[in-house]
Design a protein with these regions (language model features):
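Short linear motifs embedded in intrinsically disordered, proline/glycine-rich low-complexity segments
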Residues: 1, 55-63, 74-83, 88-103, ...
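Extracellular ectodomain segments of secreted/surface proteins
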Residues: 56-64, 82, 149-181, 309-352, ...
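Short, Φ-rich (hydrophobic/aromatic) sequence segments
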Residues: 45, 49-53, 75, 202, ...
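C-terminal domain/tail detector
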Residues: 355-607
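Extended assembly-interface regions of large multimeric machines
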Residues: 1-216, 223
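Mixed-charge (acidic/basic) macromolecular-recognition segments
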Residues: 1-30, 34, 223-229, 233-273, ...
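Short, low-complexity Pro/Thr/Gly
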Residues: 172-382
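Residues at beta-strand starts and edge strands
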Residues: 87-91, 159-163, 180-182, 205, ...
Length: 607
């Protein structure tokens, strides 16, 4: 039961006592034996009777008050099906290869990871990116401002600083050239200020890259060989379905787990440039110097073999018998305690009896109702409800209830003798358990129990986040109205609409997210035309130029650039066929242009 229901109960109990007292005074001959007053009920049997009535009427009144939120929640479930689903705990792990490994091992996305600590229950996570476990690692990282010792690269004359990464094989007998990898994925680890400044330098100030061996440049690359990670559907972390708008998911990930965007790929590598040596260097040249960052960078800030993980596992729910007397059935994972299990999404619903099986029933709001005689017209409906009590513990969570209905949304009511059994498979999380596991001092303990490869060590690089739940009940009215009206940024209210979108998706409302929202001071959109080069052919394309005004007094420059990178990808999701969007950010303090991102449509850069 929630605190909200307690208010209803107390209100009904006070009403019964007050009205009972008035009734007793008005009709003393009839109601004298009730012995009621507003402060006390003398007869304990009457007191219990009133408390029972107050409980029942409180339930009825709460159901009536919640009737409209249930409607808006159902509509949100139809148009934005994942909005009210809990967002499980997320983190970043690093996998170190064995010292005897001679080649790269790829851990696929979706690999099971367990995270635990002594005295805590085990939590199941899944990897979100394909992860390269390499036979080498970053041994040293340092940033040098000009003048610096060079490697005779052509770009050095224009460089004002250089980031030097030293790669070293796990064994002196293994050369870097043995690796056939054409891509390396790095993770920017450490304090957010360091990671964001390094991110800004790589994607705003980088003018060239060189593979260096013994102080000499062996191969040079351009900034186009750098690719930001986390902006395509294959690199999602929050488990939203394809029915949900990917731009919304991207903003939610940015607001609640920005670490997923701190990965970058170095493409089109040829490690044979390092020859037979077990060591080599990669230098990144920048057109800006940074005295503060020069003192902060270490090898811990740039890591290989990392991936985001999310607290998610597939489980079978306890089978339930479909009965005419029941209108919905609460889902409980088999062999899991209620305080450490919570349903995130339903994967499959099956109905069966002694001679029929209805497998993979569709959800009622999927919009795929069938009239074929060979298929059953039976559907399932999911309802979520916040509860603060699970398994005898005060443990906040969101319970899931399933109803079985026909195409008229009437309950499926079979005869009791037919013995229908409902089985459900769902994706679940460990409720709030993952965020409670201690972090630091060698904890938590991380392993991959289903992976056959031997790894020397797996460690957690960031504290697992708390499980996040969007507000429901009365809040759903405002949410529904905003979800329908906010994705319009071309009018004078564009900046306000953008702030409202971020506020709607900032479920926790932390001071950091509030500052981010307040930093957006203005927005302007104009029609533009750009030249497009595709497959060697040149053409012209119409698009929308978006200019955002951001306050430098509220956000630092590296925070502004990181926000702009995400918003550029977000706006590009709105580009129609044969159009593009291009984001420019200006600073309110000076009015100067801070940065202009490439024109893009969806996940593809055009100009």
């Amino acid at each position: 039961m929630s605190e909200e229901f307690l208010k209803y109960y107390n209100r009904e109990l006070v009403y019964l006592r007050h009205k009972g007292h008035e009734f007793g005074e008005q009709y003393p001959k009839i109601a004298a034996r009730l012995r009621l007053s507003e402060e006390v009920v003398e007869d304990p049997h009457v007191s219990r009777l009133l408390e029972g009535c107050a409980f029942l009427t409180a339930r009825i009144r709460q159901s009536l008050d919640n009737a409209f939120p249930q409607l808006t929640e159902a509509l949100i479930g139809q148009l934005f099906p994942d909005f009210h689903a809990p967002i499980p705990s997320m983190s970043v792990i690093k996998v170190n290869g064995s010292s005897s490994a001679t080649s790269t091992v790829t851990v696929p996305a979706g690999e099971r990871v367990t995270i635990t600590a002594p005295g805590f229950k085990e939590c199941d996570f899944l990897t979100c990116y394909d992860t390269q476990v390499l036979p080498f690692d970053v041994a040293e990282a340092k940033l040098e401002n000009a003048p610096f010792s060079g490697a005779d690269a052509r770009i050095e004359a224009d460089a004002k600083s250089v980031l030097k990464l030293s790669l070293c094989s796990n064994s002196d007998e293994i050369s870097l050239a043995n690796s056939s990898d054409k891509k390396l994925r790095f993770y920017l680890n450490g304090q957010s200020q360091v990671a964001l400044q390094l991110y800004q330098s790589l994607f705003k100030s980088c003018i060239g890259i060189a593979l260096v061996q013994k102080g000499r440049s062996k191969k040079e690359l351009t900034p186009r060989h750098l690719k930001a990670v986390g902006f395509c559907d294959e690199e999602k972390v929050v488990p939203y379905s394809k029915r949900s708008f990917s731009g919304t998911r991207m903003l939610i990930e940015y607001l609640h787990f920005p670490e997923k965007f701190l990965f970058f790929d170095l493409l089109d590598l040829d490690l044979r440039a390092f020859g037979s040596e077990p060591q080599g260097e990669i230098w990144f040249y920048f057109n800006e110097s940074n005295d503060w960052l020069e003192k902060q960078i270490t090898s811990d800030n740039i890591q290989l073999g990392c991936t985001p993980v999310i607290n998610l596992y597939k489980a079978k729910m306890k089978p339930v018998r479909v009965q005419p007397s029941e209108y919905e059935y609460q889902l409980h994972a088999e062999y899991m305690e209620p305080e450490s299990s919570e349903v995130v999404s339903i994967d499959n619903v099956t109905l069966r009896n002694w001679n029929k099986v209805y497998d993979n029933l569709p959800p009622f709001y999927a919009g795929q109702h069938t009239n074929y005689r060979t298929q059953p017209e039976i559907y399932w409906v999911l309802r979520r409800e916040d509860k603060n009590w699970a398994g005898g513990f005060d443990e906040p969570g969101r319970e899931a209830f399933v109803s079985v209905v026909d195409k008229q949304h009437q309950l499926f009511c079979p005869e009791s003798r037919e013995n229908w059994l409902m089985s459900v498979e769902a994706w679940c999380c460990n409720r709030n358990l993952a965020a409670k596991i201690p972090f630091g001092g060698g904890l938590p303990q991380v392993s991959m129990p289903d992976c056959k490869d031997n790894f020397s060590k797996i460690k957690c690089l960031s504290t697992p986040t708390e499980t996040i739940r969007a507000e429901m009940d009365e809040s759903s009215r405002w949410q529904f109205a905003k979800l329908l009206t906010l994705n319009h940024f071309s009018d004078d209210a564009g900046a306000e609409n953008l702030r409202q979108v971020l506020s709607l998706l900032a479920f926790r409302g932390t001071p950091e997210t509030k500052a981010l929202i307040d930093a957006i001071k203005g927005m302007k959109t104009t029609l533009t035309t750009g030249r497009v080069v595709q497959n060697g052919r040149v053409g012209f394309c119409n698009g929308t130029a978006i200019t955002l005004q951001i306050s430098e007094q509220i956000l630092s420059r590296e925070q502004i650039f990181f926000l702009g990178n995400v918003l550029s990808a977000y706006f590009s999701q709105f580009a129609e066929i044969n159009t593009f969007t291009q984001l420019t950010i200006t600073l309110t303090s000076t009015g100067e242009r801070f940065f202009r991102w490439p024109a893009s449509a969806g996940e593809k850069e055009l100009l």
